[in-house]
Amino acid sequence: MSGSSSRRKGARAEQAVARMLRAWGWAARTSRSVQGVQGGADLITDCPLSIEVKDHQRVELAAWLDQAVRQAEPGRPGVVFAKKRGKGNPEDWYAVMRVADLLALLKDVR
């Protein structure tokens, strides 16, 4: 896949996740839509997560999660939303994060 078509595929996945978050009541937009934003999470949102969106044929969870954690905003755990083949709705995709970050989030719902 060429670089430009790969970027378009990634942009579509990010837009789909942003729409899903908005449907759930979070403010969300792609960081690509904000001029001059480089690095950091793929989405700008008031959701308490720092989200990295992936739509790739080959799954590279360790590298993706390392990237999400490295680029996470302070106080927001990094999480990867990875598109599941054949599933257009992001609610059916995979969400991957470190166990420690998940437990920290769950601690607040006890």
Task: List the predicted regions and their residue ranges.
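Catalytic phosphate/metal-binding cores of nucleic-acid and nucleotide-processing enzymes, i.e., regions
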Residues: 1-110
